C-alpha cells in the first residue's frame, strides 16, 4: 500500500513522525483528506482534530489548536501551536479549563479577554471530542 510521510510539529517538539495512508484535518474551507500522491497544497487549519491512518491501519487522533498544513509530493507537514494525542488528554483538567472559559464568557466584564476565553473554550472542546472519539474506537 502506498504511503506518505506525515510530520506534526509544534514550536516545542515533534509530535508525530511516520508513514501514513491518509491524513484528515479541518482546513478553513472544510475537511481535507490527504492521501499519497495528493497535489501540492498549503492551507490554514482550524482548531480541531487531525486523524492519521498509519501504514499498519492504526488511526491516531490528535487535538490541535489550529495551524498550517503543507502537502509536498512525499510529505505532509502540519505546523501547530499545540497538539495533543487523544490518549494523552487529562479529561478532568480539560473540563476545568472549559468550565472556566464558559464562566468568563457568560459573566464577561471589562477585564475579560474574550478572544483568549473563546480560544480556550474551542481548544478544550476539541480535546474532549478527540477523547470521546478515542473511547468510541476502543469500544469497537
UniProtKB/Swiss-Prot annotation:
Q: List the Gene3D superfamilies.
A: ATP synthase delta/epsilon subunit, C-terminal domain (1.20.5.440), F0F1 ATP synthase delta/epsilon subunit, N-terminal (2.60.15.10)
Q: Which organism is it from?
A: Xanthomonas euvesicatoria pv. vesicatoria (strain 85-10) (Xanthomonas campestris pv. vesicatoria)
InterPro entries (alphabetical):
ATP_F1_dsu/esu_C_sf (IPR036794), ATP_synth_F1_dsu/esu (IPR001469), ATP_synth_F1_dsu/esu_N (IPR020546), ATP_synth_F1_esu_C (IPR020547), ATPsynth_dsu/esu_N (IPR036771)
Q: In what way does this protein cross or attach to the membrane?
A: Peripheral membrane protein
The text of the family note is: Belongs to the ATPase epsilon chain family.
Cellular component, GO, one term: proton-transporting ATP synthase complex
State the PANTHER family in the record: ATP SYNTHASE DELTA/EPSILON CHAIN, ATP SYNTHASE EPSILON CHAIN, CHLOROPLASTIC
Oligomeric and partner information: F-type ATPases have 2 components, CF(1) - the catalytic core - and CF(0) - the membrane proton channel. CF(1) has five subunits: alpha(3), beta(3), gamma(1), delta(1), epsilon(1). CF(0) has three main subunits: a, b and c.
* Purpose: Produces ATP from ADP in the presence of a proton gradient across the membrane.
Per the record's keyword annotation, is Ion transport included, yes or no?
Answer: yes
GO terms assigned for molecular function: ATP binding; proton-transporting ATP synthase activity, rotational mechanism
Task: Name the chain's protein.
Answer: ATP synthase epsilon chain
Record key words, sorted: ATP synthesis, Cell inner membrane, Cell membrane, CF(1), Hydrogen ion transport, Ion transport, Membrane, Transport
Compartments, as annotated in UniProt: Cell inner membrane
